[in-house]
Amino acid sequence: MDSSSSTPSTVWQQESLSQSSCAEILVQRCPACFGGISFGRPLDDGGDIHVATDGNFHHRHRRSAGDCPSFYEPSYFIPKAQVDAVGCHIDHARHHPSKSSQSGVPDEAIDQCEASYEAADGQKQKAAMDNFDDTRLMMLICRHDIPLFFANIDMPGEQQKFSIALICHLFSLLPSQANVVVLYDVGCILARSLSRVSFPARSFLF
């Protein structure tokens, strides 16, 4: 989380400049964002890539409709198993001792944000789970409003595993040195949670 910004954001930063390229699927979706070959721009200069994530509560799937026969491999939706694996890691990490972290945002302010935003309540149920098996979508878009990836939310609340799974999936398709700013309306809460657990692979800077 870049706490100096007025817009909640999470920054997942690498260190040095590399010459490489993004996965072709990203280049096809937005050449302006992902068509470059030079990565490692400092965050003070804006980083390399800007994306945003949020939940949409108006896209639901009725349980009674069932599942259609599988006839293609979805390229926009990440698998439920991938999301659940991230959730299992988060649950496991929360049982570890908290890491020491220094946040630029006081805990009191973050607590007020958590109390005032429905999206920050991971247990808030906004659709009847007995009627819908997928109650909303979590999405990741680039700075040009182009959808990159989606995840079906299949439980009450906008739990953190959905946004983190999308971010992890994005980074699996980027050069290892890419610096990315992730905007999220409750990013301050997500950043505090991540600062208290151990997360593998790349490091989050807040």
PLM features per residue range, with description:
Residues 1-206:
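Hydrophobic core positions in small helical hairpin nucleic-acid-binding modules
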